Amino acid sequence: MSRYDLVERLNGTFRQIEQHLAALTDNLQQHSLLIARIFSLPQVTKEAEHAPLDTIEVTQHLGKEAEALALRHYRHLFIQQQSENRSSKAAVRLPGVLCYQVDNATQLDLENQIQRINQLKTTFEQMVTVESGLPSAARFEWVHRHLPGLITLNAYRTLTLINNPATIRFGWANKHIIKNLSRDEVLSQLKKSLASPRSVPPWTREQWQFKLEREYQDIAALPQQARLKIKRPVKVQPIARIWYKGQQKQVQHACPTPIIALINTDNGAGVPDIGGLENYDADNIQHRFKPQAQPLRLIIPRLHLYVAD
C-alpha cells in the first residue's frame, strides 16, 4: 500500500472515530442516568510533566455535572481543546463511572456502538504504530503532519463497558514495566548504540560515546549467565475493581477514562454500590500483598537495568 493510501485511511478512520463518539455521547444522553461518580485529577503543567507524582488530590463530581465531564472527556482528542498551560505529554486521566438504565434492545445497541468505536481506535493505532513502518521517534511528526494537535493516547484509548455490576471500587496501582534480558542481549543493544554515535543532552557526542563504552564494559564483565532485568516505574494509575454478584467474581480495570456501566432492568439488575477514590499519597501506601522482592543491583540507571545478585 502506498503512503498516500495509508494517509487517506488514517484520516478516514479518525473521522469515523469522531463521528461515532459524537453519536455515542448523544445516544447516552437519551438514556436515564441512574448514578454518575467522576473524579477529576489536578492538571499537569508543562513544567511538571516529568516530575514524579508523590501526591494526587482528587475532586469528586456527581450526577449531571459528572456526566457532562465524562462525555466531554470521551471526545477530548486535540491539545487545542485544553489549556495552553497543560502538558501535552502527560496523559489526561478522568477515572469514574456512568451508570445508565437500559433494556435488552438498548443494551445491545450501545454494546454494538461502543464495540465499533473500540475497533476503529484499535485500527487507527495499528496504522500509526505498525503500518506506517516508522520508528517511534518519527511517528509523532508523521501523525501531527496530518492531524495537527492530536493527542494520540486519547485517540488510542478504548472505552470500557460493563454490564450489571454489583459494586464498583476505585483505587490506585503502582506498577513497573519489567523485562528479563540476557547479558548478550544487552551487549547487542549497546553495540548498536555505539555504532551510531550521537550527542544526547547534556552530553556531547564524545562524552556520550565514552558513557556507552563504560556501560558496555560493565555488562561484558558480568558472567554470561547473569540475570538482567529492566524494571522501569510507571506513573501511578487509577483502577476500578468490579464485583459481579451473579458470577461471584471480581474484575480489575485500568480506569484512565470513565467506565460506562449498563444496568438492565429487564433482567432485574439494580443500581450498583459505588465507592469513592481517595487522594493518592506515595508515603502512605498500603499493600494488600507484597511478595519478597528479588535482590537486585542497579547497573545502568538510564535504562533502569538491574542485575540479580
Swiss-Prot record:
It holds the Pfam family Ter. The keyword DNA-binding applies. This is DNA replication terminus site-binding protein. Gene3D superfamilies: 3.30.54.10, Replication terminator Tus, domain 1 superfamily/Replication terminator Tus. The keyword Cytoplasm applies. It comes from the Bacteria. The lineage of its organism: Bacteria, Pseudomonadati, Pseudomonadota, Gammaproteobacteria, Enterobacterales. It is found in: Cytoplasm. Keywords: Cytoplasm, DNA replication, DNA-binding. GO terms for cellular component: cytoplasm. Belongs to the Tus family. Trans-acting protein required for termination of DNA replication. Binds to DNA replication terminator sequences (terA to terF) to prevent the passage of replication forks. The termination efficiency will be affected by the affinity of this protein for the terminator sequence. GO terms for molecular function: DNA binding. GO terms for biological process: DNA replication termination. It comes from Salmonella paratyphi A (strain AKU_12601). Signal peptide: none annotated. The gene is tus.
